[in-house]
Amino acid sequence: MKKQWVSSLSGAFAYAFFVFALYAGVRHPYFMNPWMYFPLLCLGVEQVLKGKKGVLLAVVTGLSAWSNFYFFYMLTILTFSYAVIRFGFLYGKRWKSFFHLFLKGCFWYLLGIGLGCVILVPIVFAFSGSARTGGVTPFANTWFAYPLDFYKELLIGYVFPVYSANFWCVLVYPSTAFLGLFAFGKKNRQMVWLLVWFGILSLVLWIPLGGLAMNGFSYVSHRWIFGYSFVMALLLVFGIEHAECIRWKPFLIYSGLFFILAFLFIKNGGSPKR
């Protein structure tokens, strides 16, 4: 996953200043911990998949376990999804390699948990006795779809500064972050795994059951948006890196729709419900 320094720096700055980081970080500094740890966990997984030692994976796992059990749960799911998808596209159906790397990754991951168990174990016991773990909070709608107004705010909130913080769905990405979606094609398939990962996490974001699972099956919440934002930053890097592969017809359609929506957004005073 080596990238040119211009695209890498652009992705790093975008990830650091995405709106969710500013929104959540102001509310509580704990929300910044997973924002920092997740890219390092993915880098640690990448090293294990390439046959290197997983020291970085173990150390960052230990740090994230020390910091906050709640976010450690989300980080574990997101990191596992990254590892499975990356392996699938790196090694295909080589199951012998899968079990070898899986056991190797589990070793370094469990070693990291061992480093953090001094603090993690008491927190787990305290968390198990918390009132928040008493059961699933009822959801007014079906578990497989939000109300229509939520989707209106969510789609517009992808690129426009809309306070669509229902269930912590704070997005507001720069329009250039979607460049990577237009660079995929028959001649450029080495990053298809990123498109698959983006699709899976988008599905998790768009249905209440995904928010429930990512929040420990307690109630619907998408505080894991830091992981989704990391994928958006990677899409930006990929789009800049492969700008010559961008398919211009869908890109022009996207640009036209963006300017139309921007005009309507400004005309309606920034309200997606009008």
Annotated model-derived regions:
Residues K52, F71, W193-W206, N215, ...:
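Contiguous transmembrane helix-bundle modules in multi-pass membrane proteins
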Residues M1, W5-F89, K104-V124, G129, ...:
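Membrane-embedded helix bundles of polyisoprenyl
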Residues M1-Q4, Q47-K52, L90-H100, A183-V192, ...:
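Membrane-interface helix-boundary motifs at transmembrane edges
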Residues P39-Q47, T79-F87, L179-A183, Y228-I246:
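Transmembrane alpha-helices and membrane-interface helical segments
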